[in-house]
Curated annotation (Swiss-Prot):
Family of the protein in this entry: Belongs to the neurotoxin 19 (CSTX) family. 02 (D7) subfamily.
A UniProt-annotated Pfam family: Toxin_35
Official protein name in the record: Toxin-like structure LSTX-D8
Location in the cell: Secreted
Disulphides: C45-C60, C52-C69, C59-C85, C71-C83
Pro-peptide positions on chain: 21-41
Organism, as annotated: Lycosa singoriensis
Signal peptide (residue range): 1-20
InterPro entries hit by this protein: Spider_toxin_CSTX_knottin, Spider_toxin_CSTX_Knottin_CS
Expressing tissues: Expressed by the venom gland.
Keyword line: Disulfide bond, Knottin, Secreted, Signal, Toxin
Domain-level remarks: The presence of a 'disulfide through disulfide knot' structurally defines this protein as a knottin.
Length: 106
């Protein structure tokens, strides 16, 4: 048991030391430029029921959950796969339930 405590204490010390050194090395200007670069990297999301075949992880979020890129083959015609951002039914029902609970107690 004492060995476990010693190892945990050592890990906590190492993590706190490394994080404090990393924060001290960054200046405020560098932090702001890093945040600006991160914001420019963010790409626009794909709205619900729009084509997401170009990037299947680009669907927008609803109020609680992220929509899912769902692919299917339409009936009739060609065998081309179509992908759209959709909200799964179980998540839709969960959002409706939480909204009703919020309205009940809100």
């Amino acid at each position: 048991m004492t060995k476990v405590l010693v190892v945990v204490a050592l890990l906590v010390t190492l993590i706190s030391y490394s994080s404090s050194e990393g924060i001290d090395d960054l200046e405020a200007d560098e932090l702001l430029s890093l945040m600006a670069n991160e914001q420019t990297r963010a790409k626009a999301c794909t709205p619900r029921y729009y084509d997401c075949s170009h990037d299947r992880h680009s669907c927008c979020r609803s109020s609680m959950f992220k929509d899912v890129c769902t692919c299917f083959y339409p009936e009739g015609g060609d065998n081309k796969e179509v992908c759209t951002c959709q909200q799964p039914k179980h998540l839709k029902y969960m959002e409706k339930a939480t909204d009703k609970i919020k309205n009940l107690f809100g």
